[in-house]
Regions:
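N-terminal export signals
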Residues: 4-30
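Periplasmic-binding protein-like
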Residues: 24, 152-153, 181-191, 213-216, 222-223, 255-279, 294-318
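A bilobed periplasmic-binding-protein/Venus flytrap-type ligand-binding module shared by bacterial periplasmic
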Residues: 156-163, 201, 271-283, 294, ...
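Extracytoplasmic ligand-binding site segments that recognize negatively charged/polar headgroups
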Residues: 56-67, 79-97, 102-230, 234-237
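Short, polar/charged alpha-helical segment
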Residues: 36-47, 51-76, 157
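A ligand-binding cleft/hinge motif common to bilobed small-molecule-binding domains
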Residues: 113-117, 239-258
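C-terminal capping/gating helix-and-loop segments adjacent to ligand/active sites or protein-protein/ligand interfaces
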Residues: 299-355
């Protein structure tokens, strides 16, 4: 039997067939529940479950390191990390739910449009950690309490400092169209990576699809995940990256690798990465506990320390050496618009790059 293909359009069509008539922007399911503290009762209930299934697009080493901090904080609860590109995570959850397999407890995705789909389907469990209620700005949390931005990253450029002089490095996306970069560029794919899907939408909106059409003529090395281009550049397999996760480039530089991050002159595409709980979670209390700790000042501070990423928690400062978010020229995201465009973006991108 051929494997069923799941797209955002097909998943939302299922929701409409089940009686979902309102557009996403108009749908208010309920008032957000009050903020909840981590209590001894929650910890005990989580320990009885013993584990949490965490689906994420975080770089695997980061996800595992962060999860181990939680496990050390709450002994007896294991985090089972299921890491893949956000678009693959999205497809996997759809496939599992279509087969009535409810394995995912808790998710963090780099494609914020995903949570709108899951919310529309009625798959998400409203839950607001106390710190989210008190310290997360309204722009970073769902009004119904079903998801919130737990980490913020940027899709940026980078170059290998052994292969490219600082004065010759690209300053922005348009510079990559210079013939001197022919065969020297690596980039990730929006059909795999949520961060790259988000940035592809933003770049196509602001620069036009003609940018990608011209970039495709540069004999670009195509990889899957948004965490891969910085690694390829650091290894010297390509001189520059056309897109990739900023935090991975910074981590590699901190380890002494020959890589330098560039925030594009046109604006760096921002990627809001939300957390969400699933109603059908097999380990609901462990999921609540992990999600709650993730959003505490402690959890958010640890994430900044490990990754150098930004967080939504108002009490947590950026990592040393990183400017305030307000000082960064941002290419804005738009998850609700992306929700309508994602399938078209995948098709058009594949046609342009032939991959």
């Amino acid at each position: 039997m051929p494997r069923r293909t799941f797209t955002r359009r097909s998943i939302l069509a299922g929701a409409a067939a089940a009686g979902a008539q309102l557009p996403l922007a108009a749908r208010v399911l309920s008032q957000a529940p009050p903020g909840e503290q981590i209590t001894p009762a929650l910890v005990e209930a989580a320990r009885k479950e013993g584990k949490v299934n965490f689906y994420t697009a975080m770089e695997i080493n980061v996800a595992e390191q962060f999860s181990k901090l939680f496990e050390a904080k709450f002994p007896g609860i294991k985090v089972r990390v299921e890491r893949s590109g956000a678009e693959r995570v999205f497809t996997r959850i759809a496939q599992e739910y279509s087969s009535k397999i409810y394995n995912v407890d808790f998710v963090n995705t780099t494609d914020a449009a995903h949570v709108y789909v899951w919310k529309e389907k009625g798959w998400l469990q409203p839950y607001v950690p106390a710190d989210v209620a008190e310290h997360f700005p309204a722009a970073y949390k769902d009004k119904d309490g079903q998801f919130m931005t737990a980490r913020i990253l940027f899709v940026a450029l980078a170059y290998n400092t052994n292969l490219v002089k600082k004065e010759d490095a690209p300053k922005g996306f348009e510079d990559l169209l210079d013939p001197k970069w022919l065969g020297k560029i690596v980039k990730a794919h929006p059909s795999y990576s949520g961060a790259i899907m988000t940035s592809t939408y933003a770049i196509a909106r602001d620069l036009g699809w003609r940018y990608f059409e011209q970039l495709a003529k540069q004999k670009v090395m195509q990889v899957q995940s948004g965490v891969d281009p910085p690694k390829k550049v650091a290894l010297g397999e390509r001189a520059v990256m056309a897109d990739g996760a900023d935090y991975i480039a910074l981590q590699l530089k901190a380890k002494g690798e020959p890589i330098e991050l560039i925030m594009p002159a046109e604006g760096a595409p921002i990627v809001n990465s939300p957390n969400a709980l699933f109603k059908q979670a097999a380990n609901p209390n462990a999921a609540r506990l992990f999600h709650n700790w993730f959003c505490t000042a402690e959890g958010q501070e640890k994430l900044v320390q490990i990754t150098g990423q930004y967080v939504a928690h108002a009490k947590i400062a950026p990592a040393p050496g990183r400017p305030p978010l307000s000082d960064i020229k941002i290419m804005k995201d738009d998850p609700e618009a992306l929700l309508k465009m994602a399938d078209e973006i995948k098709t058009r991108y594949t046609a342009i790059f032939k991959v």
